[in-house]
Protein backbone atom coordinates (compact mmCIF):
# COMPACT_ATOMS: atom_id res chain seq x y z
CA UNK A 1 0.00 0.00 0.00
CA UNK A 2 1.59 3.25 -1.13
CA UNK A 3 0.95 6.80 -0.05
CA UNK A 4 -1.36 8.98 -2.08
CA UNK A 5 0.73 11.29 -4.37
CA UNK A 6 -1.27 14.33 -3.21
CA UNK A 7 -0.43 13.46 0.40
CA UNK A 8 3.26 13.07 -0.50
CA UNK A 9 3.27 16.56 -2.04
CA UNK A 10 1.56 17.96 1.06
CA UNK A 11 4.27 16.40 3.25
CA UNK A 12 7.20 17.91 1.31
CA UNK A 13 8.67 20.20 3.97
CA UNK A 14 11.45 21.46 1.70
CA UNK A 15 8.95 22.65 -0.87
CA UNK A 16 6.89 24.36 1.83
CA UNK A 17 9.99 26.07 3.27
CA UNK A 18 11.00 27.42 -0.16
CA UNK A 19 7.45 28.62 -0.83
CA UNK A 20 7.69 30.63 2.40
CA UNK A 21 11.02 32.34 1.65
CA UNK A 22 13.46 29.57 2.56
CA UNK A 23 16.58 28.89 0.48
CA UNK A 24 18.30 25.75 -0.72
CA UNK A 25 22.09 25.61 -0.87
CA UNK A 26 24.55 22.82 -1.64
CA UNK A 27 26.75 21.74 1.26
CA UNK A 28 29.82 20.24 -0.39
CA UNK A 29 33.37 19.76 0.84
CA UNK A 30 36.24 18.82 -1.51
CA UNK A 31 35.84 15.34 -2.98
CA UNK A 32 39.46 14.61 -2.09
CA UNK A 33 38.32 14.47 1.55
CA UNK A 34 35.28 12.30 0.88
CA UNK A 35 36.52 10.09 -1.98
CA UNK A 36 33.17 10.82 -3.62
CA UNK A 37 31.03 9.12 -0.98
CA UNK A 38 28.02 10.45 0.91
CA UNK A 39 27.41 13.75 2.67
CA UNK A 40 24.20 13.80 4.69
CA UNK A 41 22.25 14.82 7.78
CA UNK A 42 23.36 18.44 8.20
CA UNK A 43 22.68 20.01 11.58
CA UNK A 44 22.37 23.81 11.30
CA UNK A 45 23.08 26.02 14.31
CA UNK A 46 22.83 29.82 14.17
CA UNK A 47 25.22 31.36 16.71
CA UNK A 48 24.77 35.13 16.66
CA UNK A 49 25.85 36.16 13.15
CA UNK A 50 27.48 32.79 12.42
CA UNK A 51 25.73 29.96 10.61
CA UNK A 52 27.40 26.71 11.67
CA UNK A 53 26.70 23.26 10.30
CA UNK A 54 27.72 19.78 11.34
CA UNK A 55 27.96 17.81 8.08
CA UNK A 56 28.05 14.02 8.26
CA UNK A 57 30.33 12.19 5.84
CA UNK A 58 30.00 8.43 5.36
CA UNK A 59 32.35 6.07 3.51
CA UNK A 60 29.48 4.53 1.56
CA UNK A 61 26.67 5.40 -0.81
CA UNK A 62 23.21 4.58 0.47
CA UNK A 63 20.72 3.29 -2.09
CA UNK A 64 17.17 3.46 -0.75
CA UNK A 65 14.11 2.67 -2.87
CA UNK A 66 11.29 4.90 -1.70
CA UNK A 67 7.84 5.40 -3.28
CA UNK A 68 6.50 1.91 -2.63
CA UNK A 69 9.99 0.46 -3.28
CA UNK A 70 9.52 0.65 -7.05
CA UNK A 71 13.23 1.09 -7.81
CA UNK A 72 15.24 -1.31 -5.62
CA UNK A 73 18.85 -2.19 -6.36
CA UNK A 74 19.80 -5.76 -7.15
CA UNK A 75 20.62 -6.11 -3.42
CA UNK A 76 17.13 -5.06 -2.30
CA UNK A 77 15.34 -1.81 -1.37
CA UNK A 78 18.12 -0.68 1.00
CA UNK A 79 21.78 -1.19 0.14
CA UNK A 80 25.08 0.20 1.40
CA UNK A 81 27.65 0.46 -1.38
CA UNK A 82 31.07 0.70 0.27
CA UNK A 83 34.73 0.06 -0.52
CA UNK A 84 35.47 -3.64 -1.01
CA UNK A 85 38.55 -3.43 1.23
CA UNK A 86 36.64 -1.86 4.15
CA UNK A 87 33.29 -3.44 4.99
CA UNK A 88 32.69 -1.06 7.89
CA UNK A 89 30.15 1.78 7.59
CA UNK A 90 32.14 4.74 8.88
CA UNK A 91 30.85 8.19 9.86
CA UNK A 92 33.07 11.26 10.15
CA UNK A 93 31.86 14.77 10.95
CA UNK A 94 32.84 18.18 9.59
CA UNK A 95 32.01 21.51 11.21
CA UNK A 96 31.36 24.15 8.56
CA UNK A 97 30.71 27.89 8.60
CA UNK A 98 28.36 29.48 6.07
CA UNK A 99 27.96 33.11 5.06
CA UNK A 100 24.56 34.83 4.81
CA UNK A 101 24.20 33.56 1.21
CA UNK A 102 24.65 30.01 2.58
CA UNK A 103 28.02 29.61 0.83
CA UNK A 104 30.57 27.59 2.79
CA UNK A 105 33.46 29.76 4.01
CA UNK A 106 35.20 27.29 6.36
CA UNK A 107 35.12 23.58 7.06
CA UNK A 108 37.12 21.38 9.37
CA UNK A 109 37.13 17.66 10.13
CA UNK A 110 36.20 16.87 13.74
CA UNK A 111 39.13 15.07 15.36
CA UNK A 112 37.50 12.58 17.71
CA UNK A 113 39.29 11.20 20.78
CA UNK A 114 40.60 7.65 20.30
CA UNK A 115 38.94 6.20 23.39
CA UNK A 116 38.38 2.68 22.07
CA UNK A 117 38.93 0.42 19.09
CA UNK A 118 35.62 0.06 17.19
CA UNK A 119 34.17 -3.44 17.60
CA UNK A 120 31.06 -3.14 15.41
CA UNK A 121 30.80 -2.35 11.70
CA UNK A 122 28.94 0.97 12.18
CA UNK A 123 31.80 3.26 13.26
CA UNK A 124 31.71 6.84 14.50
CA UNK A 125 29.26 9.38 15.91
CA UNK A 126 26.12 9.12 13.77
CA UNK A 127 23.41 11.74 13.20
CA UNK A 128 25.25 14.30 15.34
CA UNK A 129 23.56 17.59 16.17
CA UNK A 130 25.58 20.71 16.91
CA UNK A 131 24.47 22.60 20.02
CA UNK A 132 25.86 25.27 22.32
CA UNK A 133 25.34 25.11 26.07
CA UNK A 134 26.89 27.53 28.57
CA UNK A 135 29.19 28.93 25.83
CA UNK A 136 30.54 25.48 24.93
CA UNK A 137 29.90 23.60 21.69
CA UNK A 138 28.78 19.97 21.72
CA UNK A 139 28.01 17.28 19.20
CA UNK A 140 25.19 15.01 20.35
CA UNK A 141 24.61 11.79 18.44
CA UNK A 142 24.56 8.01 18.63
CA UNK A 143 27.50 5.61 18.65
CA UNK A 144 27.14 1.89 17.96
CA UNK A 145 30.77 0.76 17.73
CA UNK A 146 31.40 0.09 21.44
CA UNK A 147 29.57 -3.25 21.72
CA UNK A 148 29.61 -6.48 19.73
CA UNK A 149 25.84 -6.20 19.18
CA UNK A 150 25.81 -2.70 17.69
CA UNK A 151 23.67 -1.30 20.47
CA UNK A 152 23.31 2.43 19.89
CA UNK A 153 23.63 4.83 22.81
CA UNK A 154 23.45 8.59 22.81
CA UNK A 155 26.70 10.42 23.48
CA UNK A 156 27.58 14.05 23.81
CA UNK A 157 31.02 15.35 23.00
CA UNK A 158 32.34 18.77 23.91
CA UNK A 159 34.29 20.18 20.97
CA UNK A 160 36.74 23.04 20.56
CA UNK A 161 36.34 25.00 17.31
CA UNK A 162 39.45 26.95 16.27
CA UNK A 163 38.73 28.69 12.96
CA UNK A 164 42.14 30.44 12.94
CA UNK A 165 43.94 27.07 12.78
CA UNK A 166 41.14 25.23 10.92
CA UNK A 167 40.76 22.62 13.66
CA UNK A 168 37.84 21.11 15.51
CA UNK A 169 38.76 18.72 18.32
CA UNK A 170 36.69 16.60 20.65
CA UNK A 171 37.65 17.50 24.23
CA UNK A 172 35.41 15.21 26.29
CA UNK A 173 32.86 12.48 25.61
CA UNK A 174 30.01 11.26 27.79
CA UNK A 175 27.96 8.17 26.99
CA UNK A 176 24.44 8.60 28.34
CA UNK A 177 23.71 5.52 30.46
CA UNK A 178 20.75 3.22 30.03
CA UNK A 179 18.01 4.36 32.42
CA UNK A 180 17.58 2.28 35.54
CA UNK A 181 14.19 1.19 36.89
CA UNK A 182 13.79 4.39 38.93
CA UNK A 183 15.14 6.82 36.34
CA UNK A 184 13.35 8.68 33.60
CA UNK A 185 14.59 10.39 30.46
CA UNK A 186 13.10 13.22 28.51
CA UNK A 187 12.91 12.50 24.77
CA UNK A 188 16.04 13.80 23.05
CA UNK A 189 17.75 15.00 26.21
CA UNK A 190 20.31 14.04 28.81
CA UNK A 191 19.28 12.07 31.93
CA UNK A 192 16.66 13.92 33.95
CA UNK A 193 17.45 12.39 37.33
CA UNK A 194 15.80 9.91 39.64
CA UNK A 195 12.32 10.25 38.17
CA UNK A 196 10.79 10.75 41.60
Where do the language-model regions lie?
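Beta-rich carbohydrate-recognition and catalytic domains
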Residues: 1-121, 132-196
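A conserved donor-nucleotide-binding helix/loop in the catalytic core
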Residues: 124-130
Amino acid sequence: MGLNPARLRAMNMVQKAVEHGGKLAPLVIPKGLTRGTGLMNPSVFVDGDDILVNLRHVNYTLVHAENSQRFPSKWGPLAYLHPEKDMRLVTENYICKLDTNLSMTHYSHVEMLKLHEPIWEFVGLEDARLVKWEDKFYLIGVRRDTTTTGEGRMEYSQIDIDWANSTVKEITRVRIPVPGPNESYLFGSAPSGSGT
